[in-house]
C-alpha cells in the first residue's frame, strides 16, 4: 500500500512538471483575465509540435461576467490569415469548466490540441479564444508554434 501511495505521488508530480507555463500575447480578453497558459509538453518556445501527437492545453482565468455557456475557437494564423484549427471539444462547459460561469470566479479550462499527420511543417501562431453566451471573449491568447515531422 505504501508503494502505491509513493508511486501515485511520483506520477502526479511528474505530470505537473510536464505542464509548461508559456509566454503568450493577450489578443483581447474582454470579460476575463488570463492568469496562466500551460501547454504540455512545451519546454521551450516557440513550442515544437510534432505531427500525429496531441498536446494538453490548460488556461487559468478569472471571469468578469456571468454566462450560461462557453465556446472555444482555435485558429492557426498563417501569413496574417486565420485558418480554423479543429479541437476535440469546443464546448467550454465540457472542458473543465462547470457552468454556469460566475462573475469573479477563477476557472481552469482544459483541452487538447491535436496535430494531424497531414499538417505541413510550418511556423504558425495559434490563437485560442473562449467566448461567453453573448460571444464576448473570456480569453484570447496567441503563442508561436512550429509544426514538425
UniProtKB/Swiss-Prot annotation:
Example GO BP:
intracellular cholesterol transport
Instruction: Note the Gene3D superfamilies from the entry.
Output: 2.60.40.770
Q: List the disulfide bonds.
A: 27-140, 42-47, 93-99
Q: Which UniProt keywords apply?
A: Acetylation, Cholesterol metabolism, Disulfide bond, Endoplasmic reticulum, Glycoprotein, Lipid metabolism, Lipid transport, Lysosome, Secreted, Signal, Steroid metabolism, Sterol metabolism, Transport
**Modified residue annotations for N6-acetyllysine:** 116
UniProt GO MF annotations: cholesterol binding
Pfam families the record matches: E1_DerP2_DerF2 (PF02221)
One GO cellular component term of this record is: endoplasmic reticulum
Name the reaction it catalyses: cholesterol(in) = cholesterol(out)
Tissue pattern of expression reads:
Expressed in kidney, spleen, liver and mammary gland, but not in testis.
| InterPro entries given in the database record | Ig_E-set, ML_dom, ML_Npc2-like, NPC2-like
- The UniProt entry lists the main location of this chain as secreted
Q: What is known of its domains?
A: Binds cholesterol in a hydrophobic pocket; there are no hydrogen bonds between the sterol and the protein.
**Task of the protein:** Intracellular cholesterol transporter which acts in concert with NPC1 and plays an important role in the egress of cholesterol from the lysosomal compartment. Unesterified cholesterol that has been released from LDLs in the lumen of the late endosomes/lysosomes is transferred by NPC2 to the cholesterol-binding pocket in the N-terminal domain of NPC1. May bind and mobilize cholesterol that is associated with membranes. NPC2 binds cholesterol with a 1:1 stoichiometry. Can bind a variety of sterols, including lathosterol, desmosterol and the plant sterols stigmasterol and beta-sitosterol.
Q: What is this protein called?
A: NPC intracellular cholesterol transporter 2
Q: Which gene encodes it?
A: NPC2
